Amino acid sequence: MLSRLAQASRLGLMTARLSQPVASPSLRAIPATAPHFASPWLRSYSKRSSGQPPKESKKKPSQAQNDAEAAKTPEKPAENDVNKASEQSPEAPKEGEQIPFHKLPDLTQGIPSTLFEEMGGDKKKEQQALQELEEAESKGNERDRSEYVSTSERNRKWWTRFMLTAVAAGGTLSLLYMGRNWEDTIEAERHSDSPNGPSPSLWWKRAKARMTESVTYYQEPAFEKLLPDPDPTFERPYTLCLSLDDLLIHSEWTREHGWRIAKRPGVDYFIRYLSQYYELVLFTTTPYATGEPVMRKLDPFRLILWPLYREATKFEDGEIVKDLSYLNRDLSKVIIIDTKAKHVRNQPDNAIILDPWKGDKDDKNLVNLIPFLEYIHTMQYSDVRKVIKSFDGKDIPTEFARREAIARKEFQAKQLTHKHKHGSGVGALGNMLGLKPSNMNMMVSPDGEQNPAEAFAQGKMLQDVARERGQRNYMELEKQIRENGEKWLKEEAAMMEAAQKEAMNSMMGSFGGWFGGNNPPEKKA
């Protein structure tokens, strides 16, 4: 409190001196900022920037008050402060130099303010303090940038460790669970190489077997046997597998028409003619949902006995493969016709690869293959793979027609010299084709047909007799389809509707049993 009074008295003395008329050069030399250096608690008004002389103050301090304050405060310290301030100020005039009146501060309106200078000084001090602090930290506590780890980086590392630990724990528990003993005797018999037991090796074998099964479920065909066991009464010893896309049909999409499907020329004749010789199987990579509606239109009378879709194929090395070993048929009597060699890479000796059909309406490649397939059935070869191998690298229809023409020429020449030997026609045909027939199923003629001996005497070959019989059977089938085709389709639709109703009734009966209802009454026979 006393210090404030002392400062106030000192201020009053300085104010009184400055308010008096100019009398002393020493007082004129006092700069305008002297009160600021004399006391940090003083605030005054700033100087006028204009050169106009200040107006007279309306309120003048009394002389008695100035004298009283001057008596209380010694004059010498104030003069020392003023001298110090004049030395510190760079703009202060030299000693003895008179200051112009318009440059003096206007004290009639009060003491000039030093607020802006104080605030500017405080900011400079703060900035200087911050710079000093940063320099001190950089020098004293300096560390490498690589040692700094942000919060997000720490969180990421924590979650990474947590996830790795969880995965390791889950994998260990899964391995222990999958390595348990087999639950029934059927599984134990199916995995005889990994029997039950507590040893770690057997545990690992069982876990490996279960993991392999879980993966092969999506890679292997839906069933181990895609076709039922062959019927002994079914008089078709050979199986012919046909692809769908670009072999029997061609599908394309356009902006104008959307999806359109074209049927290959001669497909109906090809299917109906060979159905008397082969067990026809559709083996395609098209899914069931897409291929089944197409097959209903393509083969409404079900001459293709077994349709196999994408679900029956095998996924191997990133590609879809048609594995014939799952057909439940003797591979020596299986032929597959496809447009892509990679689809039949597991059994290439059983495959006939044709060029993809792209919609050409004059195409005859499929129909031209009928004589070769008919000849295989006629000669009853024990292994069709050897026959197909003999045409390796050649166009089968063209090469077969060439061999048949040579055989016919030789046969006719021998017929002229050996008319009494009718069996020579069969031997000449097989020898010229480079094939040896194992059984001649055409030697016994049905009722109403020409005897083979008579046919040979007329210059006909065995293959000619087989074609005549095949054409008669085909014409009979066409007649049956024309007369009874609609009836067959209606009967099939009625059977399907009855099966659907039966399935619906069975399902509703099951629901009634679950919810406590009565079972539907059984129909009396």
UniProtKB/Swiss-Prot annotation:
* Pfam families reported in the protein's UniProt record: NIF (PF03031)
Q: Which GO terms describe its biological process?
A: protein transport
Q: Which ranges does the record list as Mitochondrial matrix topological domains?
A: 46-161
Compartments (UniProt record):
Mitochondrion inner membrane
Which Gene Ontology cellular component terms are annotated? Answer: mitochondrial inner membrane
Under the heading SUPFAM superfamilies, the entry gives: HAD-like
Q: Where is the composition biased (Basic and acidic residues)?
A: 69-84, 136-147
Q: Where is the FCP1 homology domain?
A: 233-376
Recorded superkingdom: Eukaryota
Query: What spans does the record annotate as topological domain Mitochondrial intermembrane, numbered to this chain?
Result: 180-525
Q: State the protein's purpose.
A: Essential component of the TIM23 complex, a complex that mediates the translocation of transit peptide-containing proteins across the mitochondrial inner membrane. Required to direct preproteins in transit and direct them to the channel protein TIM23, and possibly facilitates transfer of the translocating proteins from the TOM complex to the TIM23 complex.
Name of the protein described by the UniProt record? Mitochondrial import inner membrane translocase subunit TIM50
Q: Which organism is it from?
A: Gibberella zeae (strain ATCC MYA-4620 / CBS 123657 / FGSC 9075 / NRRL 31084 / PH-1) (Wheat head blight fungus)
